Amino acid sequence: MTTPNFELYGYFRSSCSGRLRIAFHLKSIPYTRHPVNLLKGEQHSDTYKSLNPTNTVPLLVVSNINNTVSPSSASFSIGQSLAALEYLEEALPTNARPLLPPISNPVARAHVRTICNIIACDVQPVTNLKIQKKVKALDGDPTVWSRDLATQGFGAVEKLLELSAGRFCVGDEITLADVCLVPAVWAAERVGMDLARFPITKRVFEEMLKEEAVQKAHWQKQEDTPEDLRA
């Protein structure tokens, strides 16, 4: 069986890119990074648009595979972070650390996915750079906007963690819920959200920060992180 090659196009501060960086490091899967500077508009270049028509990051390009979607192509692109995370779970089920509960536990798997989707669908899209620019153009305060919506979203996450948290979001093993949680907290802290309002979320986040994979994936330690922001 051939080993897929992975190329990740992302931005150091993108929480969606951070999810994939954490997953790759947790699974010890090698990948090639391609920085895309969102502030310089590199996501709108013709070159990048040819790879990802949504002009967003991250983009995961997988090559050296049997491409059943487009058989004439030797590579396959995934332009949504949750889809990419699920792909890694399904494409490498036996030789990489699992980030979903066993298939024999569909309830726990659904709970993990619910937490992921609250973060990915209800929190991140309404607080990202694109929306912040729109809010500012309407004479709103993008920081207040982002902080208020992030606080609402994390309130929902906290309620779910009351049901399931052990050492991590769902029990005592790291799952995709934790992978999504960490970059979301990074983003929320940048707009001044008080994480102390959510004690279970705070505890799980701090537990995740102890993981070497999370430390390697931290936005302050990426090759495209500006020198003045590096840790």
UniProtKB/Swiss-Prot annotation:
Residues annotated to bind glutathione: S14, Q43, V57, Q80, S81, Q124, N128, L129, K130
GO molecular function: glutathione transferase activity; maleylacetoacetate isomerase activity
UniProt-listed Enzyme Commission number(s): 2.5.1.18
Residue ranges constituting the GST C-terminal domain according to the UniProt record: 105-227
Coiled coil: none
InterPro entries, sorted: Glutathione-S-Trfase_C-like, Glutathione-S-Trfase_C_sf, Glutathione_S-Trfase, Glutathione_S-Trfase_N, GST_C, GST_Zeta, GST_Zeta_C, Thioredoxin-like_sf
Enzyme class: transferase
Keywords for the protein's UniProt record, in alphabetical order: Transferase
GST N-terminal domain boundaries: 4-96
Keyword presence, Kinase: no
Superkingdom of source: Eukaryota
Catalytic reactions of this protein: RX + glutathione = an S-substituted glutathione + a halide anion + H(+)
A single Gene Ontology CC term: mitochondrion
Transmembrane segments annotated in the record for this chain: none
Keyword Transferase: yes
Gene Ontology biological process terms in this record: glutathione metabolic process; L-phenylalanine catabolic process
Assembly and interaction partners: Homodimer.
Similarity comment text for this entry: Belongs to the GST superfamily. Zeta family.
Protein name, per record: Probable glutathione S-transferase
